[in-house]
Amino acid sequence: MREVISIHVGQAGIQIGNACWELFCLEHGIQPDGQMPSDKTIGGGDDAFNTFFSETGAEKHVPRCVFLDLEPTVIDEVRTGTYRQLFHPEQLISGKEDAANNFARGHYTIGKEIVDLCLDRIRKLADQCTGLQGFLVFNSVGGGTGSGLGSLLLERLSVDYGKKSKLGFTVYPSPQVSTAVVEPYNSVLSTHSLLEHTDVAVMLDNEAVYDICRRNLDIERPTYTNLNRLIAQVISSLTASLRFDGALNVDVTEFQTNLVPYPSVIIRPSTPAEKAYHEQLSVAEITNSAFEPASMMAKCDPRHGKYMACCLMYRGDVVPKDVNAAVATIKTKRTIQFVDWCPTGFKCGINYQPPTVVPSGDPAKVMRAVCMISNSTAIAEVFSRIDHKFDLMYAKRAFVHWYVGEGMEEGEFSEVREDLAALEKDYEEVGIEIVEGEGEEEGME
């Protein structure tokens, strides 16, 4: 088997986790108590779903996941919620006091006390796997636990499971909406770890997802439940090929191979868009709509950058012939630009399982959908926004004493800031080299 272990850190990670497992259970016909009635054998009784669920002797299906938080309130909601019987009590780990939106508390002081317990639980899950493929880590980088404990955990996972893939699904601070004053500090500090310790980091941004809910799903005032369910649809599409059989299945390691051109462009900021919901659209139409700026789940305009790589994950009633035609059309468009050293740039996956929707959920039931995950130079916009806010605060050393008081050194701030500046520069250079090349060609003509 090619098992995958999911790790949900902090409030955002846990709430996205709730939405994801709710959806996975519906997709596989697993009830909230973990039972899977035999008459609902989806996919003819194959065991592809065992990549995400382990089976106990009592025929109960238990998610291969761990929920971690430094304070109990959010995890208590899982302990008392609809799916309380689904999870093993040992998989829900909470501390006594929270990280107070402080990266240093999550990473150095309070996080340090709980991290060994977390790794112990992860080790138990890993021991149950016959061929562990990798980890999916869910967190946000604006708060204290997601950023601090999340990056500490990634560092430790790199040591213990060096060769395993690590995919991060990370919620970045939104341009306009802020939940904490110190968000820029936390995000820059934890991006440093994401760069070093994840293989692919998928960026999500509440404001962008909020806009999709409002514009595409006509929800006037989206709640976090709406946002999380939409994010869960995206994650479900990305992992569908691990859980179901399809025509062109995509492995976790294949994301890495296809999205990462060379190591300096490491954060592989993939901006996924889950498309199609209302009318029955053709494959070409859903493919085109996936490339629209309005579909991006991180606030950046892909028209300002160039694509280095792009994975298209189709599900439902889709045949390879239609996909090839749709991709050929995209390649002829002038608005969608690829870097010239990567002319093909497309990786496609097809899965025959159509998207499942949560009863009373927002998206309508559709026959086919596409989820795009891409590496584009436009993502530099996200970093420059965060960097700018970081610089404004750090110039005055505002709030720095809270971090130093928890055992951090001030030098760390400038070190991680330089790292991010280098990343921004990498993305810019990828774009610039190309412009020079185009100029030469015109000169020759």
From Swiss-Prot:
Binding site for Mg(2+): E71
Residues found modified as N6-acetyllysine: K40
Post-translational modifications: Acetylation of alpha chains at Lys-40 stabilizes microtubules and affects affinity and processivity of microtubule motors. This modification has a role in multiple cellular functions, ranging from cell motility, cell cycle progression or cell differentiation to intracellular trafficking and signaling.
Single GO MF annotation: metal ion binding
Function: Tubulin is the major constituent of microtubules, a cylinder consisting of laterally associated linear protofilaments composed of alpha- and beta-tubulin heterodimers. Microtubules grow by the addition of GTP-tubulin dimers to the microtubule end, where a stabilizing cap forms. Below the cap, tubulin dimers are in GDP-bound state, owing to GTPase activity of alpha-tubulin.
Protein family: Belongs to the tubulin family.
Protein name in UniProt: Tubulin alpha-1 chain
Species of the source: Stylonychia lemnae
